[in-house]
Amino acid sequence: MKKILIGLAGIILLAFIAFYIATKPTETKEGTYIPSPLALKLATSPTTDFDNTIYKNPYTGNKKILMVSTEERNMTMANGKKFSTGNHPVEMLLPILHLKNAGFDVDVVTPTGKPVAIEMWAMPEDDENVKKIYAEFKHKLEKPGSLANFVTNSLKDSTDYAAIFFPGG
């Protein structure tokens, strides 16, 4: 009976250690943190539910969508550590897929024109549609326009845009 209890205690201890490791945020090589392996398993998916909707009457005009994205890569937490953040790839790229299928072009800006920060840890690696639109938009995401310049120079007289899109993150 004593050996059984010791064995059971060992199994419980290993389970607690595994749970602790799985729930601890992961430090990146840059010294920032991303969600724990358990959080990533529970809150992200390797695919999306994008169904490649075909719109019967896609937009055929010249107006575009202006996507305003974040360029902020890190958020300082209460303990002083930095959490890697940015635009969530699914919350940004799935709407772009739908907008493109609906007939719209999308322009990309960030507050100062620095590259769009993307939470790459949340990228659905097995989703071909998301990977394709990411590759298509990579240049725009790396070299976006500046929202500050847009507001100063173009906003007052701009009739180029049908909507402004603020993706989540």
List the model feature ranges, each with a label.
Residues 3-169:
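Extended, subdomain-level signal for the structured scaffold at the beginning of enzyme domains
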